[in-house]
Design a protein with these regions (language model features):
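Terminal low-complexity/charged segments
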Residues: 1-186
Length: 186
């Protein structure tokens, strides 16, 4: 990815810049999200929000996550050429992450991910005033993961029934259900 003139350091409230697999992630605190989003849109040309994702990192790195299937000692059975030894994934700063996938298409097409972290119940501001396409994405993050989004114009469930209890994509969501009778069963 092409770094803008002057580097990413000009993004307001920037806490960290991560480069992995040719992708750039800009990490900001929730209170700096809107300023960073407006700067990326207005000054750096990231006018297109392609996706918003919410991720629950409960239990990281204790569980097999993101291809890591191993033990606390670092043995990963997915890496036979390295005798199954790999460093443990880095601890995450908080339980939940919101990722905003942005695209600049005007002069030189490029992508960047804007990321913010929060604990359970800690709100994140809505980016709908910056990118109106975030509307349904943020509703999905609320509905499926339980992210509290301040200032959203219509924060109601979008996928689950209105009377559904809980948020199904959370790692602590109870598994199980009710038995279902299929036709032909006695």
């Amino acid at each position: 990815m092409t770094t803008p003139a002057g580097g990413w350091e000009s993004v307001p409230g920037l806490a960290d810049v991560k480069e992995a697999h040719g992708e750039t992630t800009l990490v900001v605190e929730p209170e700096n999200l809107i300023d960073a989003a407006m700067y990326l849109r207005d000054e750096l040309g990231f006018g297109f929000l392609s996706d918003v994702t919410a991720v629950d990192y409960l239990g990281w790195p204790d569980k097999g996550v993101s291809g890591f299937i191993g033990t606390p000692g670092g043995r990963d059975i997915n890496r036979p050429m390295t005798q199954g030894h790999q460093a443990l994934p880095a601890a995450k700063p908080k339980r939940f992450a919101m990722n905003y996938h942005l695209l600049a298409i005007a002069d030189r097409p490029q992508r960047v991910r804007l990321q913010t972290w929060m604990e359970d119940g800690e709100p994140v501001p809505s980016v709908v005033p910056v990118w109106p396409t975030a509307d349904w994405h943020e509703r999905e993050a609320y509905d499926m993961v339980g992210i509290q989004i301040d200032g959203h114009p219509n924060l109601v469930r979008i996928l689950m029934d209105d009377d559904w209890e809980g948020h199904p994509l959370r790692k602590d969501y109870p598994l199980g259900g009710e038995p279902v009778r299929f036709s032909g069963e006695e």
